[in-house]
């Protein structure tokens, strides 16, 4: 068992750990947070610990960070076990004397983010006699006096600090400054709290005029649960960030507020959730991401909806008030009234220190130095009048990025045309740049470069289906041999398919500041050379439709053959519509990332087409209100069960074979969204994908500040029909759809 030493920062003794806590140590724990005790601790550190204090973590090479954490920052497991036993002994003593129903462990100790050496912790005592938040205000001090008295009777020393008693739990190699906090327990079960808990919290705070976050300790159980679900490696990253923060404090004359430490822990969790979510990640990459976020305090707005959300009006108003307040905002995920990131004048100092480490040689041992793509604030809290700025600042790639992408694409296209099939009978007919980069809708750091390579040996849809996997393998083989003679680094993604349709890889080069992800797809040249005044060969579609009728072909299986048409359909659109497309894609990606468990969502291309349709039908102008466009697309997603959308720009109802096929397509189960380049491609898919999940997310977003305009109320969607018919597209055909003649 460990020593329970109060107010005494003497070195550990070799005896007295067998049972309970040894009395001893001078009275009077220093009243400030842990960082105020650093000088006292320093004098009693072992030589190795003293050495650690002198080594700036910012000087540790990136490849050695993991070893640094394991060797210097992580507490010893046996020490933590002894700490647990000592804390449990405190709990056993107190519950035998006072009406404590249960306890929760908080602070760094409870969150399992305690640093080796000295750290903070709390033992929250849920008092059986506290029936409401107000009781905590009325009776907390009285119970602290009772607890202090019982501790003295048992020769256990403590110091009263604000609304807590502070004791030191000490074992060899580890000390915890433990606050004892008698509080009200608003959670009557182990389940997630209902909105009533937070409505009651707001009501009680108003009655007693409590400060924001004053009752946050009541939610320690939730805080413990919140951190428990995260992988150990993320907690190791938190230790690294906290250790850096402690070293920063030593340079500052005035100690920062204790909540800032918790804010950095939450910011680290946010960075990992938004940018990684993998249990095995590069530690330096995580550090760079956190430091980049710290550099942007005036934009930081971080929150979670795991314990509270926007459904209840009272809770929604609390949240919106917080999210509209001055940045930085980092909300406690267990208490919406508690902004632990509030700026008390220290963020500027922290920003300077973050910049110094971020651009230090030790953290830039490779070029480019990778980091996760994480925004400092979510789209949800962006006011409607700032959406254009959000797109420009966070989503739209700069000219340098686009130049880098172009250079990378040119490198691969040159390889495909001039090297890959040099000694083969197969010839490259053409390479076509596809995907968001070619369409002009690429996201900053979040878009792939697609290259479709049309090969002479692929002479039909059938030959493409049969032979494309061998061409994928051949391209990979040739590329692997070629890069050995170049200053490139290529990492191939292992396909989950036995017969892969695409070669996916990441390209790094000394000439590129960013690594670029590629998808290379072999294709059959069904269209030949396109010209703007050229009417498409009807054979291309006729052959495709006949093949689909005779064989079990998945819808859109050969859409890759029509990449040029897909690209041109978007590429020619106004710049502002492309901005709206970026916004919708970002919204989609954010939901895709947070969705648990994972499900099969509709393809992003479906959302792109839905966005174009909304603009065509609702605006059609080069200059429109982004918030209205965004709101309209979400409205269409919510109405997915009614959607029937198609275009007649590349095919129409004139030819008999096409007319019959299209009439069959548009009478399928909703939603129906036909690819304007490929009539066999229904990216709406009926019930093939989980549209209902996307619709639920869209409904939640209707309460977002994105759609609130002061004085004018809510942003209204454009008036857009959810269903098209051949007649509405000028086809002079009025079929029966859903039992109604259109």
From Swiss-Prot:
One GO term of the biological process aspect: regulation of lactation
Sample GO molecular function, one term: metal ion binding
Tissue spec: Expressed in the uterus. Expressed in mammary glands: expressed at low level before the establishment of lactation, then expression strongly increases, and subsequently decreases during early involution.
EC number: 2.7.7.84
Result of altering residue 538 to L: Strongly reduced 2'-5'-oligoadenylate synthase activity
Enzyme class (EC, first level): transferase
N6-acetyllysine PTM sites in chain numbering: 417
Record's keyword annotation contains Translocase: no
Biased composition (Low complexity): 10-21
Compartments (UniProt record): Cytoplasm; Cytoplasm, Perinuclear region
GO cellular component, one term: perinuclear region of cytoplasm
Effect of residue 405 to N: Mice display postpartum failure of lactation and strongly reduced milk protein synthesis. Otherwise, mice develop normally and mammary glands are normal
Domain of life assignment: Eukaryota
Region of interest (Disordered), residue spans: 1-35
Cofactor(s) demanded: Mg(2+)
Catalysed reaction, written as an equation: 3 ATP = 5'-triphosphoadenylyl-(2'->5')-adenylyl-(2'->5')-adenosine + 2 diphosphate
Entry comment on modification after translation: Myristoylation is not essential for its activity. Glycosylated. Glycosylation is essential for its activity.
Documented activity regulation: Produced as a latent enzyme which is activated by double stranded RNA (dsRNA) generated during the course of viral infection. The dsRNA activator must be at least 15 nucleotides long, and no modification of the 2'-hydroxyl group is tolerated. ssRNA or dsDNA do not act as activators. Strongly inhibited by copper, iron and zinc ions. Partially inhibited by cobalt and nickel ions.
Region OAS domain 2, annotated ranges: 382-721
Keyword Amino-acid biosynthesis: no
Subunit field text: Homodimer.
Name this polypeptide is given: 2'-5'-oligoadenylate synthase 2
Upper lineage: Eukaryota, Metazoa, Chordata, Craniata, Vertebrata
